[in-house]
Curated annotation (Swiss-Prot):
It comes from Mus musculus. Residues 403-422 have a biased composition (Polar residues). A zinc finger (C2H2-type) spans 469-492, 861-884, 1063-1086, 1091-1118. One of its GO terms (cellular component) is nucleus. One of its GO terms (molecular function) is rDNA binding. This is Zinc finger protein basonuclin-2. There is a cross-link at residues 305, 424, 444, 449, 669, 922, 947 (Glycyl lysine isopeptide (Lys-Gly) (interchain with G-Cter in SUMO2)). PANTHER family: DISCONNECTED-RELATED, ZINC FINGER PROTEIN BASONUCLIN-2.
Length: 1127
């Protein structure tokens, strides 16, 4: 049973060793009672202790004289400390090795350290395992000449400075280190953990940084030891393995990041270098360093030239180095790297980290005996420049294949025979002129393996000469650099650049791509989305500025941060290296998403990526990394889109199909809910069950207007406001102030991708007949398939739902200036528009839901069309695009009832002044017809049709009632009429005398829209008729009975065409079964007939829309054409 023994006095750092005195003698020497020992027993031994002290004092003077003589006779002048022969004292290293009585090592084995910073301090309590163990106390004396310090006492501020003599720790520690190598240069020692502990204390005890040369040498010694021994040495000296591999301590015990470091002096470094002459693993390296030290080449002379000259010099010297060898060494097999080097295989060790839980040896995948088994199939996952490759940066010419030949005893560890071809060189920053170095400690059995590796590296390097390129990370070859880049980004790229827009989680492989993406004001590019597994860890790490809270190391967790909604990502399972208990795994797995500089370092290290002391040493607390993260605020002109959680899709939507591996390697685009990619624009009109979607009027809520919505650069609120929909009645009057197509560019980006390939507004009216005609079919929404149903319920029409359109009253003048831009009269048209809007009676009826209730809920997550609820407003928008797209876009000009499935078509129609000329002027007030002549309407209509089609075909359509007018003209005639609803509003109330005058105005308005849009006969003959019919159904001003009957009769055109089961060509009167066949007929047979001048009374026709528009917009060509009012 172990007994407690009190510590020595605090003014002396002492060690235990086997000797002739017992435990009571040691306690009596310090006059300290021991637990369980009678104090009277200590007094009985007092006389013997006095005799021992007197003998020790008498022998001290001869010993110092011998030390002085040895120092004067030493040929090495750099040795400033006193040395003793091995026979001088039996406590030197030369005699301790075989007996295994190293005091430093045995003390560290038996003493639990109370503080990592004062390992060699005086506050320790040895636990004796055997009651009869014989101990002796020996002080570490100062070896400097004329210093009478008997025992090293660590300083309160600097542990390496003795409080008694003010000399350093190295001057005292040499008292216990062997100098046998100075007298027997041909002999080498076996590397043992106790000896390495003593030598390591010279450079690690009380310091916070390690000189590079000493670290190179100490790494060689550590490579021979077991990992448990290495960890014990480091922890005993106040270092963690992570700090040692880094080369300096990043954070102190309190967690503070250090900005200054204590390091041993240059004189102490020279003294310590001599200790490495004792081992064959380091002897040749030290000899070369000594030669360079004497020649003065170890210190690089500062250059007065610029950095470019320095870079040119270094690059010119590096041309002799084999790139293939460097690439192979950077990505060599982990088994060829020592276990203490394999742990930090990324740049994360250069930055602050957090300790989570101490990781035990079984969790790290260590075998029971501490050996690291070789795994040839595993490779490093990152080509990062870390400390582990410090020794491998040398060319083939620098590696000397001649091993150091010496008598080597059997090794204690099998890892000694797994050493790699390592150059014994200093880093270039210490000695850039160094070009060659010998290699030591290579067995003869390694030559075949080394030659095979070099041959393989040469074979890999020759791949580039064949036109192929190989990946530096895994060695695979590819046809070209583009394929290699895709492979590298997908497999090996861990350093990514995140978009600076808040809420956008896009990551890019280059700053150039990231900056180009961040500068794009299009909010669609910055929408949050779920990414593939490769980017989940980055999204999780960047979800907050502060360090996220860890719920469990292995369970799923949610990272939260203030000011941002939680990201519902779950942590992937731990690396298989950590979960597999087999001893064949590596010590630690490769770190992921590690950034090379603090502003980009956001990754949270897993427990397997930590290095914690196995003992009960205090570890650094969790330090928030927010101080090292630079948040780049977005420019004021860039939108700040709030993050929207897209964790679940709507119930009816399936997951989007997986992308190809090549596509997933690039920055991931927005993953939307499932979207029908078919040509919905061409097929939407084919649905016979769709009700009339041409809305009479639309009222815009002024409170929802946003000037930010109007500017493409300030479309901040696009995603929060434009998702709201309005349940509006057929009788609502829409405001005339609207946005032009150019103002809708940010919103237009949400259109189907098929529209993105179509020409812009400025080009659409002049070029691209195919695009123009294919979009005309999107303009007017159909309702011809249900004429009977629509006429049967004149007073109970279902409410039409239209997506809210955002306008701003301040944009009225800009809107009119756009009209003037296309027609050459901005100021006059603005004045006309002002007078026109002042003459209108704007009404804002209450908005109704499909059930007839007021739409009082402003929740943007509910579809007011079908009353479905969604997870987010973004899901609602996708739902509208996929389901209710036909009900969204109505012409923004008051009085025009054309509706379109896309904003682009609607905006192009709204911006055409010729289609709304008579709606924007008061000339219609002067044209009136006698109210007693209701039958004049048909005659005028026939005359009008004769003027249009007189030279092309006769009016011989006697078989059909009122079917002589083409669809476009019929649409104009029927515009504004349909059913009689007493509560409905007039479309245009410009009359003051009679309703017939109003009807004349309305008919004149319809006549101006005879074409409805460019080339309406090409793709929208059915659309025009449906538009007219649905307009009639949706608009019903109060008219005299006779006029209403006349209008009802005119509806039979579309009714007959729909009831006959086919669609008639209005030019050759052939019947076709579906609209698709009719469209093909128009394109192939009547292409020239399609582009007729849109000015009523002008019979000019053109082969292209561009020519027709140029003709139609020229008012000088239509001066002699009188306006005709048709009833």
């Amino acid at each position: 049973m172990a007994r407690f023994v009190p510590s020595p006095p605090p003014n002396c750092l002492s060690y235990k060793s086997e000797g002739r005195l017992g435990e009571q003698d040691w306690q009596a020497h310090f006059k300290v009672p021991c637990c369980g020992v009678d104090p009277s027993q200590l007094e009985s031994e007092e006389a013997e202790v006095d005799v021992r002290e007197r003998d020790t004092q008498r022998d001290r003077e001869p010993k110092r004289a011998r030390d002085l003589t040895l120092r004067d006779s030493c040929t090495d002048n750099s040795m400033q400390f006193g040395t003793r022969t091995t026979a001088a004292e039996p406590g030197f290293m030369g005699t301790w090795q075989n007996a295994d009585t190293n005091l430093l090592f045995r003390m560290s084995q038996q003493v639990p350290l109370a503080c990592a910073g004062r390992v060699l301090g005086a506050d320790f309590c040895p636990n004796l395992e055997e009651p009869d163990q014989r101990l002796e106390v020996q002080a570490i004396r100062c070896t400097l000449v004329n210093c009478t310090c008997e025992c090293f006492q660590p300083g309160k501020i600097n542990l390496r400075t003795c409080d008694q003599c003010k000399h350093g720790w190295v001057a005292h520690a040499l008292d216990k280190l062997s100098t046998q190598h100075l007298y027997h240069p041909t002999q080498v020692e076996i590397v043992q953990s106790n000896v390495v502990f003593d030598i390591s204390s010279l450079m690690l005890y009380g310091t916070q940084a390690v000189p590079v040369r000493l670290k190179i040498l100490l790494d060689r010694l550590f490579s021979v030891l077991k990992q448990e021994e290495v960890l014990h040495i480091l922890h005993g000296l106040g270092w963690t393995l992570r700090d040692y591999v880094r080369g300096y301590i990043l954070q102190d015990a309190a967690g503070k990041v250090l900005d200054r470091w204590a390091i041993m002096s240059r004189e102490e470094e020279i003294i310590t270098l001599q200790q490495f002459l004792r081992f064959g693993e380091t002897k040749s390296i030290v000899e070369l360093m000594a030669i360079q030290e004497k020649e003065g080449q170890a210190v690089a002379v500062p250059s007065s030239k610029t950095d470019s000259d320095i870079r040119t010099f270094i690059e010119s010297n590096n041309r002799t180095r084999s790139p293939s060898l460097l690439a192979h060494l950077e990505n060599s097999n982990p088994s060829s790297i020592h276990h203490f080097e394999n742990i930090p295989n990324s740049l994360a060790f250069l930055l602050p980290f957090q300790y989570i839980n101490p990781v035990s040896a079984p969790l790290l995948g260590l075998p029971p005996n501490g050996l690291l088994l070789e795994q040839p199939g595993l490779r490093l996952r990152e080509p990062s420049i870390s400390t582990q490759n410090e020794y491998n940066e040398s060319s083939e010419s620098e590696v000397s294949p001649t091993p150091y030949k010496s008598d080597q005893t059997p090794n204690r560890n099998a890892l000694t025979s797994i050493t790699n071809v390592e150059p014994k060189t200093e880093p270039a920053c210490v000695s850039p002129i160094q070009n060659s170095a010998p290699v030591s400690d290579l067995s003869k059995t390694e030559h075949p393996k080394s030659s095979f590796r070099i041959h393989r590296m040469r074979r890999m390097g020759s791949a580039s000469r064949k036109g192929r390129v190989f990946c530096n990370a895994c060695g695979k070859t590819f046809y070209d650099k583009g394929t290699l880049k895709i492979h590298y980004n997908a497999v090996h790229l861990k350093i990514k650049h995140r978009c600076t827009i808040e809420g956008c989680n896009m990551v890019f492989s280059s700053l150039r791509s990231r900056n180009r993406h961040s500068a794009n004001p299009n909010p669609r590019l910055h929408m949050p989305m779920l990414r593939n597994n490769r980017d989940k860890d980055l999204i999780r790490a960047t979800s907050g500025a502060a360090t996220p809270v860890i719920a469990s190391t292995k369970s799923n967790l949610t990272l939260t941060s203030p000011g941002r909604p939680p990201m519902g990502f779950t942590t992937p399972p731990l690396d298989p290296v950590l979960q597999n208990p087999l001893p064949s795994q590596l010590v630690f797995s490769g770190l992921k998403t590690v950034q090379p500089v603090p502003p980009f370092y956001r990754s949270l290290l897993t427990p397997g990526e930590m290095v914690s002391p196995p003992t009960s040493l205090p570890t650094s607390p969790i330090i928030p990394t927010s101080g090292t993260i630079e948040q780049h605020p977005p420019p004021p002109s860039e939108p700040i889109v709030p993050a929207v959680m897209m964790g679940t899709h709507e119930p009816s939507a399936d997951l989007a199909p997986k992308k190809k591996p090549r596509k997933s390697s690039m920055p991931v685009k927005i993953e939307k809910e499932i979207i029908d990619t078919a040509d919905e624009f061409d097929d939407e009109d084919d649905d016979p069950n769709d009700g009339g979607t041409v809305v009479n009027d639309m009222s815009h809520d002024n409170h929802c207007h946003s000037q930010d919505e109007m500017s493409p650069g300030m479309s901040v609120k696009d995603f929060s406001k434009h998702n709201r929909t309005r349940c509006i009645s057929r009788t609502e009057i829409r405001r005339a102030d609207s946005m032009t197509s150019e103002d809708q560019e940010p919103e237009r980006d949400y259109e189907n991708e098929s529209e993105s390939s179509e020409p812009k507004l400025g080009e659409e009216s002049m070029e691209g007949d195919e695009h123009l005609h294919s979009e005309v079919s999107e303009k007017v929404l159909m309702n011809s398939e249900r004429p009977d149903e629509n006429h049967s319920e004149p007073s109970h029409q279902d409410v039409i739902k239209v997506k809210e359109e955002f306008t701003d009253p301040t944009y009225d003048m800009f809107y009119m200036s756009q009209y003037g831009l296309y027609n050459g009269g901005g100021a006059s048209m603005a004045a006309l528009h002002e007078s026109f809007t002042s003459s209108l009676n704007y009404g804002s009826p209450q908005k109704f839901s499909p059930e007839g209730d007021l739409c009082s809920s402003p929740d943007p997550k509910i579809c007011y069309v079908c009353k479905k609820s969604f997870k987010s407003s973004y899901s609602v928008k996708l739902h509208y695009r996929n389901v209710h797209l036909k009900e969204m876009h109505v012409c923004t000009v008051a009085g025009c009832n054309a509706a379109f499935p896309s904003r682009r078509s609607r905006d192009r129609h709204s911006a055409n002044i010729n289609l709304h000329r008579k709606l924007l002027t008061k000339e219609l007030d002067d044209m009136s017809l006698d109210s007693s002549q209701p039958s004049l309407s048909k005659d005028l209509r026939d005359e009008f049709l004769m003027k249009i089609y007189g030279a092309q075909h006769p009016l011989g359509l006697d078989g059909r009632e009122d079917a002589s007018s083409p669809a476009g003209t019929e649409d104009s005639h029927l515009n504004g009429y349909g059913r009689g609803m007493a509560e409905d509003y007039m479309v245009l109330d410009l009359s003051t005398t009679s309703s017939l005058q109003s009807s004349s105005s309305v008919h004149s308005s319809r006549e101006s829209d005879a074409g409805s849009d460019e080339g309406i006969l090409l793709d929208d003959i059915d659309g025009a008729s449906d538009s007219g019919e649905s307009t009639h159904k949706a608009e019903a001003p109060t008219l005299p009975g006779s006029l209403g009957a006349e209008v009802s009769g005119s509806l039979m055109f579309s009714s007959l065409s729909g009831s006959n089961g086919g669609i008639m060509c209005n030019i050759c009167h052939k019947m076709y079964s579906n609209k698709g066949t009719l469209r093909v007929h128009y394109k192939t047979v009547h292409l020239r007939e399609m582009h007729k001048c849109k000015v009523p009374g002008c019979n000019m026709m053109f082969s292209s829309v561009r020519s027709r528009n140029r003709h139609s917009q020229n008012p000088n060509l239509h001066k002699n054409i009188p306006f005709t009012s048709i009833d």
